[in-house]
Amino acid sequence: MTAVASSAPAAPIRVPAGTTAGAAVREADLPGRGAPDAIVVVRDAEGRLRDLSWTPDTDVEVTPVAADTEEGRSVIRHSCAHVLAQAVQELFPQAKLGIGPPITDGFYYDFDVEEPFTPEDLERLEKRMRQIIKDGQLFSRRVYESKDAAREELANEPYKLELVDDKSGDPDVMEVGGDELTAYDNLNARTKERVWGDLCRGPHIPTTRYIPAFKLTRSSAAYWRGDQNNASLQRIYGTAWESQEALDRHLELIEEAQRRDHRKLGVELDLFSFPDELGSGLPVFHPRGGVVRRELEDYSRRKHLEAGYEFVNTPHITKEQLYVTSGHLEWYADGMFPAMHIDAEYDADGQVRKPGQNYYLKPMNCPMHHLIFRSRGRSYRELPLRLFEFGSVYRYEKSGVVHGLTRVRGMTQDDAHIYTTREQMRDELTRLLEFVLSLLKDYGLDDYYLELSTKDPEKYVGSDEIWEEATETLREVAEASGLDLVPDPGGAAFYGPKISVQVKDALGRSWQMSTIQLDFNMPDRFELEYTAADGSRRRPVLIHRALFGSIERFFGVLTEHYAGAFPAWLAPVQVVGIPVADAHTPYLEEVAAQLKSRGVRVEVDSSDDRMAKKIVNHTNMKVPFMLLAGDKDAEAGAVSFRFGDRTQINGVPRDEAVEMIVRWIADRINEVPTAETVKAGAAK
């Protein structure tokens, strides 16, 4: 969620042999403790972060890392996690330590304790942490002579003992890594005696006083190493920042994010729900949510037809062999629901007369689209062939990661598969990226960057040469767009590299939206061919593309982006008529009929509530246009506009008001209407 500004990268400095990095930082007169941009660590020529106590053997050039950069904040948070662990073991001496990494905007630490932590426990821990920070304990790096020495020291820490031999490369495991096994001791600032310590590869800030602002946010249960077969531990989450101002800003964003939480708004606005009877991650859309979803899909359909896509439909289940051919059962089985074994026939004795077959709920639409391509001979004249489907797919997500609409088990993807020649590939990718960005902008999402996900060396199909060609092609197309491109090493699916569009919402949070995946492998597995101009048979290049990612996820992101106040063209109810008194209801019903004839979604509130209460109710339901009418309005054939920001436009002739509303909706204006913006629009 980080929306707090970061400082620009610092210029490199030189650290003479035998001198600490911290001394070089002071010699360069760079900001020290107490400044928001205090230098907390340095980065060496190999890109490794080093403590300020690091003393190189030769003269080296390093880059100072400030507290108000993402790397600097990560170091502060990691050190704050150590302070938390020290406080826990002081207040709960029987607690055993798990892992405690920095994470986006914060940190956590896992503990094996007898009872879950309470809010009162967190308050006590915060108080103790503040004292540790005030004491200015030193972080001191120490190298173990051997693994046996580490095991001896950590004999009473079973989870740390497991990590001593860890070779998983898990980025969350900050305890081990690199070519040495190290610990960080917290030393008394005056006596230099060891107060506490932890198995850790570092780096860390010089002293605890480099943590100017922190807060513990919550606690929860968590399985050791994220495996439900392991012990259940207690996890404490916290956040730490380079200044109190930055922390306050972050907490304000957290509060605003909670206000915008789509799960909360889904209930308040009657959009969707998650009935227990259906199971985790399986949402149902209510009529109001169905309107928004239909508008999202209908506009997308129209734009896809204009862009030359052909619509297809495929079933929700399939025989096992399809996913053997595609490789999903080999590489993606953990993300699929278990097989359904059906169609077996038995005789009177219960003996199998005809064996059954395994069927699977489809986790992806692509294999079925390949069958459509393969259903008849194809010519180069048909390419690029763009197949598109709003296809329902089902993926087994662990219950712990299912989250509202943004992480579900049953979803609908706006899924396209494009079959091109190699000669068409680059132009098609460029055209496709432009189409994706244009459509996202139409929905009001116009702040984005690109991410390039490359091969996972342990999980891929096809040759290295094909992967390299596909990756470089995507890289060139992405760079040509002029957008920022961020690497995602090892993040690709097993069948090809991808570009993903990372969208920033109104709070500055990044969401992965559209994906464009290049695939030279699947055409081989399905033996897809077309007849080239010279009569030869060739393999097409395959491009996988999902613009929304899934309708459900996109719906959730838009709900939070707009805080539930959808643009008028998407709003479930676009206009509500509010009579000053019951006598004015028939007049507003005439106005409503006029709007309905123009395709506007309109209601008239004829409830027994007073007018003021009705205005509050419909403001809370985030209806973009409220039309009020009393005696003067009805006599003059006019209405008064009321908007969510409490502004009004009084006495607007009804025909003019209808045209203003119809034009606003037809123009697909994404901002919330106000008296000022509607008047400005009417004046054009």
Swiss-Prot record:
Enzyme class name: ligase
Enzyme Commission number(s) from the entry: 6.1.1.3
Free-text comment on the cofactor: Binds 1 zinc ion per subunit.
Domain TGS: 1-66
UniProt region (Catalytic), positions on chain: 261-567
Keywords: Aminoacyl-tRNA synthetase, ATP-binding, Cytoplasm, Ligase, Metal-binding, Nucleotide-binding, Protein biosynthesis, RNA-binding, tRNA-binding, Zinc
Organism domain of life: Bacteria
Gene3D superfamilies named in the record: 3.30.54.20, Anticodon-binding domain, Bira Bifunctional Protein, Domain 2, Threonyl-trna Synthetase, Chain A, domain 2
Entry annotated with the keyword Zinc: yes
Catalysed reactions listed for this entry: tRNA(Thr) + L-threonine + ATP = L-threonyl-tRNA(Thr) + AMP + diphosphate + H(+)
Annotated compartments: Cytoplasm
GO BP annotation list: threonyl-tRNA aminoacylation
GO cellular component, as recorded: cytoplasm
Residues bound to Zn(2+): 366, 417, 544
Listed GO MF terms: ATP binding; metal ion binding; threonine-tRNA ligase activity; tRNA binding
Cofactor(s) this protein cannot do without: Zn(2+)
CDD domains with a match to the protein in the record: ThrRS_anticodon, ThrRS_core
Assembly information from the UniProt record: Homodimer.
Record family assignment: Belongs to the class-II aminoacyl-tRNA synthetase family.
Summary of the function given for this chain in its UniProt record: Catalyzes the attachment of threonine to tRNA(Thr) in a two-step reaction: L-threonine is first activated by ATP to form Thr-AMP and then transferred to the acceptor end of tRNA(Thr). Also edits incorrectly charged L-seryl-tRNA(Thr).
Protein's name in the database: Threonine--tRNA ligase
Organism (species): Mycolicibacterium smegmatis (strain ATCC 700084 / mc(2)155)
